[in-house]
């Protein structure tokens, strides 16, 4: 639940992360050990244009953005990221934490197309 609240905060600031994966979620220290923090905003992007007060226009990115294992199906298909894609990545992370692995993890080295097919 805490990770969803953190992601909601990022989205409320008009940003999408675009590279959610377990190594980008860290736990606090000392009295903050119960808090999860999302880090590494190197691939993040604004999804809301403050000048026009509109969502950014749809573009095909023509390439995978982020980690293939935890990225959304849209990312595998080269589509523009949105808030939904961050939520899909978070769902994969939660499944990974619960089960210890994802069904498509071994397919990563064989190509992104197989990973995308497995997710669909």
Protein language model features and the residues they cover:
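Short C-lobe core helix of eukaryotic-like protein kinase catalytic domains
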Residues: 1-12
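Activation segment/activation loop of eukaryotic-type protein kinase catalytic domains
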Residues: 28-65
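Catalytic-loop of the protein kinase fold
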Residues: 11-29
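Protein kinase subdomain VIII
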Residues: 52-54, 64-79
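Intrinsically disordered, low-complexity regions enriched in proline, serine, glycine
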Residues: 19-20, 37, 47-49, 103-107
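Conserved C-lobe activation region of Hanks-type protein kinase-like domains
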Residues: 30, 73-120
């Amino acid at each position: 639940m805490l990770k969803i609240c953190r992601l909601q905060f990022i989205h409320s600031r008009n940003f999408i992360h675009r590279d959610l994966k377990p190594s980008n979620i860290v736990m606090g220290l000392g009295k903050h050990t119960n808090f999860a923090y999302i880090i590494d905003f190197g691939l993040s992007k604004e999804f809301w244009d403050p000048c026009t007060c509109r969502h950014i226009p749809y573009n095909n990115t023509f390439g995978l953005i982020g980690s293939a294992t935890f990225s959304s199906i849209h990312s595998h298909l080269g589509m523009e990221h949105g808030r939904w894609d961050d939520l899909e990545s978070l769902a994969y992370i939660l499944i990974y934490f619960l089960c210890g692995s994802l069904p498509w993890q071994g397919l990563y080295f064989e190509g992104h197309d197989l990973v995308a097919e497995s997710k669909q």
